[in-house]
Amino acid sequence: MKVIVLGSSHGGYEAVEELLNLHPDAEIQWYEKGDFISFLSCGMQLYLEGKVKDVNSVRYMTGEKMESRGVNVFSNTEITAIQPKEHQVTVKDLVSGEERVENYDKLIISPGAVPFELDIPGKDLDNIYLMRGRQWAIKLKQKTVDPEVNNVVVIGSGYIGIEAAEAFAKAGKKVTVIDILDRPLGVYLDKEFTDVLTEEMEANNITIATGETVERYEGDGRVQKIVTDKNAYDADLVVVAVGVRPNTAWLKGTLELHPNGLIKTDEYMRTSEPDVFAVGDATLIKYNPADTEVNIALATNARKQGRFAVKNLEEPVKPFPGVQGSSGLAVFDYKFASTGINEVMAQKLGKETKAVTVVEDYLMDFNPDKQKAWFKLVYDPETTQILGAQLMSKADLTANINAISLAIQAKMTIEDLAYADFFFQPAFDKPWNIINTAALEAVKQER
């Protein structure tokens, strides 16, 4: 069996690993359009801040190691078209320009997503950067130590934008974050959390300019200013982090796509064409808290999808179990994590929810290491089933969110969670874990 895998990031990499595990005798061809195999953009902040010294180490696997395991690895090589009826792909060598046709028995594509860029006046000025991929990582790193870069403007206040803002603030730059939304990280966290994080960022030389729309860039050859509908900001460097779009324009007319360009797949990762599977950021994914399909661009999601595509390669035997959309991030001294439904997602889905928020020290009063923690538990008011949670502290409590992710997947209720068994040791916790405490408050709220 000959299997072709497109994409060397999260989903593609995991598909290759699972192929080696379940189909060791398969002929595997692994294609990457770029010149570098398996770069992890989610590790870029560690490199920009100098915690990781070698940009080439920010990866899952080298092409050489995969070659030694029997995989035929092709970098600088683009699959430009699929001919599903013939079980063929058109392949272009981006160095030589030569094209060829490759046959396949099975095809797994993980085309990913590409960053949105603002189509506004001045967009062609120099020093307007993106934050995705190895080449941009190298360019951004150079700017962290460039003495001519003093004012950095980040457009977008999601995870990528906040990572960029923190990296440049730590490099001693004056940073402004602009977003059309009314608060930073508003897609991931509710207001009681983002209020605290906004104060933390402002205390670290970051200006938060939310509720503003960028209208144009200004400059002479290179960007010097950003103008919004409300203000103007000096800018020696602009980092655009306003989301992504699926890299699927080349698939129109070949595979069935949703109106937004995402690839239609079933619960076995199969596309509309036989023997063609799709995974990762260019697909929808089963979202357990709302029992629906949404697009959640997370590495963990793509990795699991890659594995399940291979499990179902020959027969549809393992339906994808779904995800809760769990994620986390550090913002200077604060660490937070979230899973499932928050207020923004509930409104988007039209789902009624109730919630309780607990703010307390996570250790006993006598423990000098105690730190304040914020925990919000979201549940269904009719069934009392757990739907989501958010957690934040200067202590790293983020792993606790994994318990809530499991609770959502297991369809646990607030009553189940209130008396769930968590260990107690004064150096690590309190007799009632903050998860228990929040669930108990929810039970009281429903009496």
From Swiss-Prot:
Pfam families: Pyr_redox_2, Pyr_redox_dim
Binding-site residues for NAD(+), renumbered to this chain: I160, D179, Y188, G243, A297, G328
Catalysis: reaction(s): H2O2 + NADH + H(+) = NAD(+) + 2 H2O
InterPro entries, sorted: FAD-bd_OxRdtase (IPR050260), FAD/NAD-bd_sf (IPR036188), FAD/NAD-binding_dom (IPR023753), FAD/NAD-linked_Rdtase_dimer_sf (IPR016156), Pyr_nucl-diS_OxRdtase_dimer (IPR004099)
Residue positions where Cysteine sulfenic acid (-SOH) is found in the record: C42
E.C. number: 1.11.1.1
Record key words, sorted: FAD, Flavoprotein, NAD, Oxidation, Oxidoreductase, Peroxidase, Redox-active center
Molecular function terms from GO: NADH peroxidase activity
Residue positions binding FAD: G7, S8, S9, H10, G11, E32, C42, S110, P111, G112, A113, R132, D281, A299
Enzyme class: oxidoreductase
Active-site residues, Swiss-Prot/TrEMBL: H10 (proton acceptor), C42 (redox-active)
Self-association and partners: Homotetramer.
Function recorded in the entry: Peroxidase whose active site is a redox-active cysteine-sulfenic acid.
Protein name: NADH peroxidase
Source organism per UniProt: Enterococcus faecalis (strain ATCC 700802 / V583)
